[in-house]
Each structure stands twice: as structure tokens, then as C-alpha cells.
Design a protein with these regions (language model features):
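"A position-specific structural signal for the A-helix of alpha-solenoid helical repeats
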Residues: 58, 92, 126-129
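Radical SAM enzyme [4Fe-4S]-AdoMet core and its adjacent flexible, acidic
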Residues: 118, 132-186, 259, 280-287, ...
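Membrane-interface junctions of multi-pass transporters
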Residues: 176-219
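Conserved alpha-helical substructure of the radical SAM core
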Residues: 179-180, 219-361, 371-389, 395, ...
Length: 488
């Protein structure tokens, strides 16, 4: 080859481009080993991209075998800079760094993968493995596996969560990101007894929890699951590969979590880029969906939760649903409300007939100061919030609400206020304060998310975050640290 550096550079670029083409072809041909009922959903939602990472590693092995001078790490470094939207590439890069003994680089690469796709279970598993390898004081993934093998979660046997596209989940989609069907295409009964639902339940019963997020689920990270020997676990058994009830009726779900309308009176940056209110046509479709798909299974439910997608009072659709709920029509039904509290005032309460039905109210706040609230709750008024909190607190004191919780999503912008937030919650007589780490719901670029993700050891304020977690307020009885414990 000529010694001309320009010619050499062009040849190198051409060779690299050809290698990229072959790698992309291998990834494209990769077979997803998940059962067919899950593989189709994985194609669109990408909840487990392990097969893509495996395809990358296999291709690197082939290239190295064919050409011993092939530098797999250098290639992946170059490839990741030009294929920066595929988390599988960064997972593979993290694994290569780990093989080379490069701890900081491995952590940086896997953090990038996580920033690109928050619900990819494989990225999460690799993150936990690499973090423990780099820092043995971190949570040991094998110890967590052993814990899960002896414990049980009732959610896949009880919960039925709707989302805007019609998909149904048996838990929060961030905690168990695998849909079991689509209510716009199938009946609730068919979905609830379907193959996907059965597989998710089997993953609990066999102790693998293979479809659950060990990173985002607070019940897993805080180890608050019931023992597998508990009554809840023994009320379910499997015959011939299918779950059959002993003491529970599994014909229909007992808990409905309605998150199919994203309408909200606020535009919180961690949740959405702009205000979302259902237009007339959308409202009509939502009402038809309610009448045809939700109302028929409501009489079997024992708990309804509104809403994890927007606000129950900021949504005309959900507010209309709340107005038809009453003790006479649904004598066994309890109601959970998840709201920003801006519209939950005396007038809104008077429009409802929920007396004696409200089990839990969770107010999502994320701030203890007006100036921070103005940013994290775009469109909201801190003064209005405080007025409404006083009213809601009085409902709790009067027994109209059985449990009152405040929630806080920790991020770079607000984490300094966590101790003050606990004190604020105590002032209003709150039963529980829920903390969780910020997640990327698709509203942030990878760079923007990295700037807010205070749980990364690479964040310039990470050490200060650890100090805040050790504050006296964060150890008080009403505090649940959620998944924050994983980032210590």
C-alpha cells in the first residue's frame, strides 16, 4: 500500500464502512429467542435487546477469527460514535471495556446505553453487573437473584394497566416493560388469560423475575416483596403449564390502573415536551374505549388507580369516569388517585361521590421551593398547590382519604430539596413520602438526560447527592427511598 496518508486514510475509512455494513447486516438478521407472543412486542418496544448485543459480540468474534489484527475495541469505539442511537452498541462496548479491565470506560458506556433506552432490561442487567464489578460495595446481582428466588409479587396476577396505544401491562411499564396484549384488538378476558400473561406469571412463580426491572422497581431494590411461602403465593398454582386459582378468582383482574389518557394541566419537562389535552375526536375515541373495554370489567375490580399518564382532574375523560363512581353502584371498589394536586380542590371534590371509596392519594410534587416548582411543574402555581394540599390534608384527617402520599422524582435540578420536602410532607400529615430516580420517558436527548441523571457517579454533583441521601430527614419513618438506594 502507498505511504500517502491521504490514500491510507481513505482506504481505512472504506474498510471501516464495509465493516459497519457487515455488522449492521448481522444485527438485522439476528433472531430474537423470546417466545413469539413476546418477540413481536419486543420488536416495537425494545424491552430486551440482548439478542442485538449478542449479535454484535458474535460478529466481533468472527472478524477477529478471520483477521487476528482486527482491533475489536477500537472498532466499537469508532462505531459507537457514528451509531449513537442504538443502546445495544454501547452495551457491547461496555462489555468490551470490562474484558479489557477498563472500569471507568465500561461504566461510562453502559450509562450511555441506559440514557438511550431506559426500559431495556438487558442494559439494566449489564449495568448492575458492571457496577458491582467496578465497585464491590454496590449491590451484588447474584445476591439479588437469590432474594428474588425466594420471594413473590402479586402484580402479574392482579394488575391490568392501560396505556394510550391500547397495550396492557401487569405492572408499571417501567418496572415490567412487557405488554400482555392490546385492548383495542382483543377482549380483556382473552388478554388476561393469554400466553404472554401466563409467561409473566410463570417468571414470578419460578423465582426468576426475568421480565422485571431490578433497577427501577422499588419493591425489588428495597426488598419489600412477600416471601414465596406467603398466603399470596400459595393462592396461585400451575397445572399443565397454566395458572389456576385456589383461593383467588383469576378470570378478570382485581386492580385496574388507567393510564390511557395523557391529558394533563401541566407540562412537566421530565414527562413531556408540551401540554397535552385530548381534542374532541380523541375524547370521543377515549369514551368509546371506556364504554366498550373498561366499564365491562369494572364490576369485577376491587381497586382502580387513576392515573399514571396525566392527571385525573386535568383529563376530561378521567374526570367523567370519576363522576360515575359511587358506593351504591360499585360497593366493593376502592379508588387510588395520582395527581399533581393543582385542580384537586374543594369544588372538584364536591363534584364527586367518592366518599368512603378513596384508599390512597399520591400528590406528585418534585420540589419544596416555589422557584424549583415553577420549572419542574411547568404551568403550575406553588401557591395554589399549597392551598390544595391543606384541603387534601383535611380530607385525610377526616378519614375521606385512607392514605396520603407525596412523591418526588430526584434529578440534578431538585435533589438538594429532598430533606425540605420530607419536612414539608410531615407538616401536611402525610403517611408516606416516595422518592424515585428520574427516568427518560423519551423527552430528553441522551445528553440532556445525563445532565439531570444525578444517580451517575460521573455527574459532578453525585457526591453531594450521596450526602443528601445520608441526611437525617431521609431516614425518617415515612420515607420510602424507592430505587434511589441502587445509586448509593
Amino acid at each position: 500500500m502507498t505511504d500517502n496518508p491521504v490514500v491510507n486514510s481513505a482506504a481505512t475509512t472504506a474498510n471501516f464502512s464495509e465493516q459497519q455494513r457487515r455488522l449492521n447486516a448481522s444485527i438485522h438478521k439476528a433472531h430474537d429467542p423470546l417466545p413469539p407472543c413476546l418477540a413481536e412486542a419486543n420488536k416495537f418496544r425494545g424491552f430486551d435487546r440482548k439478542f442485538r448485543t449478542d449479535a454484535i459480540i458474535a460478529w466481533l468474534d468472527q472478524e477477529e477469527a478471520a483477521n487476528p489484527s482486527f482491533d475489536r475495541l477500537s472498532f466499537l469505539q469508532m462505531h459507537s460514535s457514528s451509531a449513537s442511537t442504538d443502546p445495544a452498541v454501547f452495551v457491547a462496548l461496555a462489555l468490551e471495556y470490562k474484558a479489557a479491565g477498563l472500569k471507568e470506560e465500561a461504566l461510562s458506556a453502559i450509562n450511555r446505553a441506559m440514557a438511550l433506552h431506559q426500559t431495556d432490561l438487558h442494559s439494566q442487567r449489564v449495568f448492575m453487573d458492571i457496577r458491582f464489578w467496578a465497585d464491590p460495595s454496590a449491590q451484588n446481582p447474584k445476591e439479588l437473584d437469590a432474594y428474588l428466588a425466594e420471594h413473590f409479587c402479586a402484580y402479574p396476577f392482579e394488575h391490568f394497566e392501560t396505556v394510550p396505544d391500547g397495550n396492557i401491562f401487569v405492572c408499571c411499564p417501567s418496572y415490567l416493560p412487557v405488554p400482555i396484549g392490546n385492548l383495542k384488538k382483543e377482549t380483556a378476558e382473552r388478554i388476561w388469560a393469554g400466553d404472554a400473561a401466563q409467561l409473566l406469571r410463570e417468571s414470578i412463580l419460578d423465582g426468576s423475575f426475568r421480565y422485571c426491572s431490578r433497577l427501577h422497581c422499588g419493591r425489588i431494590s428495597n426488598r419489600t416483596l412477600n416471601l414465596a411461602k406467603s398466603h399470596s403465593a400459595h393462592s396461585i398454582k400451575i397445572k399443565g403449564g397454566k395458572q389456576e386459582p385456589e383461593e383467588q378468582d383469576l378470570a378478570l383482574p382485581k386492580v385496574l390502573v388507567l393510564s390511557h389518557d395523557r391529558s394533563c394541566n401541566l407540562a412537566c419537562p421530565s414527562c413531556r415536551k408540551d401540554f397535552i389535552i385530548a381534542k374532541k375526536e380523541e375524547q370521543t375515541a377515549l369514551n368509546i374505549f371506556l364504554e366498550e373495554s373498561i366499564i365491562p370489567i369494572l364490576s369485577n375490580a376491587r381497586l382502580i388507580n387513576i392515573t399514571g399518564s396525566g392527571d385525573p382532574f386535568g383529563s376530561n375523560h378521567f374526570r367523567a369516569l370519576l363522576k360515575i363512581l359511587n358506593r351504591d353502584k360499585y360497593p366493593h371498589l376502592q379508588v387510588d388517585l395520582h395527581t399533581n394536586g393543582q385542580l384537586f380542590d374543594e369544588r372538584a371534590w364536591a363534584e364527586l361521590s367518592l366518599h368512603g371509596m378513596v384508599r390512597n392519594v399520591e400528590i406528585s410534587i418534585d420540589a419544596a421551593k416555589a422557584e424549583t416548582y415553577a420549572v419542574v411543574r411547568r404551568g403550575g402555581s406553588f401557591d395554589r398547590l399549597l392551598r390544595n394540599l391543606k384541603f387534601i390534608s383535611n380530607l385525610r384527617k377526616a378519614g375521606e382519604i385512607k392514605q396520603l402520599a407525596f412523591s418526588f422524582v430526584a434529578q440534578a435540578l431538585n435533589f438538594e430539596e429532598m430533606p425540605a420536602f420530607v419536612r414539608m410532607a410531615e407538616y401536611y400529615g402525610v403517611d408516606r413520602v416516595e422518592f424515585n430516580m428520574i427516568r427518560n420517558w423519551g423527552t430528553f436527548s441522551a445528553e440532556e438526560f445525563s445532565a439531570e441523571f444525578i444517580g451517575s457517579k460521573f455527574h459532578p454533583l453525585y457526591e453531594r447527592f450521596l450526602e443528601i441521601l445520608e441526611s437525617e430527614e431521609m431516614s425518617r419513618e415515612i420515607v420510602s427511598r424507592g430505587n434511589l438506594t441502587l445509586y448509593q
